[in-house]
Amino acid sequence: MIDHALALTHIDERGAARMVDVSEKPVTLRVAKASGLVIMKPSTLRMISDGAAAKGDVMAAARIAGIAAAKRTGDLIPLCHPLGLDAVSVTITPCEPDRVKILATTTTLGRTGVEMEALTAVSVAALTIYDMCKAVDRAMEISQIVLQEKSGGRSGVYRRSASDLACQSR
């Protein structure tokens, strides 16, 4: 049997949830990239690309929502440290015929990583796209939200395989 209390940093020796103490960790440059897809009808993608959505510029709204969400991650995820982010970028790329790819990059000089901020940015950007387009396509699917890479800190560099970075079907 695996002792998960030893493997999971947010669980103490009694099995209770806790916020990890990072005060002794050195300040280093931390960067994370996450991505996700919103799969939709081809007509919905055309509407977004043409800027014809009734609620306005879908991609601009989703970018801003993703950036705002990254900045609020510590408020949304209970055991996540509140961080002063030095940079957040969210890009949204239409991928013919039926999806958009969202990529978020988060950066800070700090004692803990920014993976949750990047993942939160992608998630909220995807939800914003869904919200703005649901009147014409309730069957949209938010899919494959994953950490693409992270660097900085004791655990070093992580990179998902390059083939997972492209706009592609499952």
UniProtKB/Swiss-Prot annotation:
One of its GO terms (cellular component) is extracellular region. The active site is at 131. Keywords: Lyase, Molybdenum cofactor biosynthesis. GO terms for biological process: Mo-molybdopterin cofactor biosynthetic process; symbiont-mediated suppression of host innate immune response. It catalyses: (8S)-3',8-cyclo-7,8-dihydroguanosine 5'-triphosphate = cyclic pyranopterin phosphate + diphosphate. GO terms for molecular function: cyclic pyranopterin monophosphate synthase activity. Induction: Expression is positively regulated by the transcriptional regulator MoaR1. It is an enzyme of class 4 (lyase). Its EC number is 4.6.1.17. Pathway: Cofactor biosynthesis; molybdopterin biosynthesis. Disulfide bonds: none annotated. The keyword Lyase applies. Disruption phenotype: Grows normally in liquid culture, traffics into host (human and mouse) acidified compartments early after phagocytosis, suggesting it no longer arrests phagosome maturation as well as wild-type, impaired growth in mouse macrophages. Substrate binds at residues 79-81, 116-117. Homohexamer; trimer of dimers. HAMAP family: MoaC_B. Belongs to the MoaC family. NCBIfam families: moaC (TIGR00581), PRK09364.1 (NF006870). Catalyzes the conversion of (8S)-3',8-cyclo-7,8-dihydroguanosine 5'-triphosphate to cyclic pyranopterin monophosphate (cPMP). Probably plays a role in host phagosome maturation arrest. This is Cyclic pyranopterin monophosphate synthase 1. It comes from Mycobacterium tuberculosis (strain ATCC 25618 / H37Rv).
